Amino acid sequence: MSIDWNWGIFLQQAPFGNTTYLGWIWSGFQVTIALSICAWIIAFLVGSFFGILRTVPNRFLSGLGTLYVELFRNVPLIVQFFTWYLVIPELLPEKIGMWFKAELDPNIQFFLSSMLCLGLFTAARVCEQVRAAIQSLPRGQKNAALAMGLTLPQAYRYVLLPNAYRVIVPPMTSEMMNLVKNSAIASTIGLVDMAAQAGKLLDYSAHAWESFTAITLAYVLINAFIMLVMTLVERKVRLPGNMGGK
């Protein structure tokens, strides 16, 4: 099959917005980056919290962490997106729900719903990475910290977590890259990210190959940058003689 490529389409004036089609893609690129960064911050903080809970010697707290993981990990992500956008606002107190649905700009609604959904979904995966890393550490580290007079929270803060985070840099890199790719699902609830902009470009120009090739390359570049940065981080923080450190 012969494909008639026309990359000049990106420099043509878009039908609205006082910009070019390339401007549409660039706008979507910025939204994707902003969503990914905000969602990752939520995922890292919440995932670390529940990952710690899953390792503490308290059945209730450990069970709470397990419940969180099972809830978010076993429901399809696209279902969670629509739940956050359509269902959660209805469960909020009436004034807050009405403010979210009627007064907040729709684009902000889409962004907040997507950010919370993607962040909390990824947090369940981060939780398991943190749990596995803490449990992989020699038991003597925790015992030695407690023997030195540190409280359990202090042992986690000063001994266990610094070592655990060094161990999980590679799997955390994979989770960051997965988050960027999963962000494309946000377009299904109305967020105008790269995937949505490519769809618009296709609708108005009928250039499917160029539209989706462009955003494919954009996603590849984003994740290649993440891989490069995290590889440098891994080399910087790894411990000699520990988990492949040299």
Swiss-Prot record:
Disulfide bonds: none annotated. It is a multi-pass membrane protein. Its main location: membrane. GO terms for cellular component: ATP-binding cassette (ABC) transporter complex, substrate-binding subunit-containing; membrane; plasma membrane. InterPro entries: AA_ABC_transptr_permease_3TM, ArtM/GltK/GlnP/TcyL/YhdX-like, MetI-like, MetI-like_sf. It is found in: Cell inner membrane. The chain crosses the membrane at residues 33-53, 74-94, 104-124, 179-196, 212-232. Residues 54-73, 125-178, 233-246 are cytoplasmic. GO terms for molecular function: transmembrane transporter activity. Disruption phenotype: Disruption confers resistance to cellular contact-dependent growth inhibition (CDI) CdiA of P.luminescens strain TTO1, but not to several other tested CdiA toxins. Coiled coil: none annotated. Keywords: Amino-acid transport, Cell inner membrane, Cell membrane, Membrane, Transmembrane, Transmembrane helix, Transport. The keyword Transmembrane applies. Residues 1-32, 95-103, 197-211 are periplasmic. Residues 29-230 form the ABC transmembrane type-1 domain. Pfam families: BPD_transp_1. One of its GO terms (biological process) is amino acid transport. Part of the ABC transporter complex GltIJKL involved in glutamate and aspartate uptake. Probably responsible for the translocation of the substrate across the membrane. The complex is composed of two ATP-binding proteins (GltL), two transmembrane proteins (GltJ and GltK) and a solute-binding protein (GltI). PANTHER family: GLUTAMATE_ASPARTATE IMPORT PERMEASE PROTEIN GLTJ, MEMBRANE COMPONENT OF AMINO ACID ABC TRANSPORTER. Belongs to the binding-protein-dependent transport system permease family. HisMQ subfamily. This is Glutamate/aspartate import permease protein GltJ.
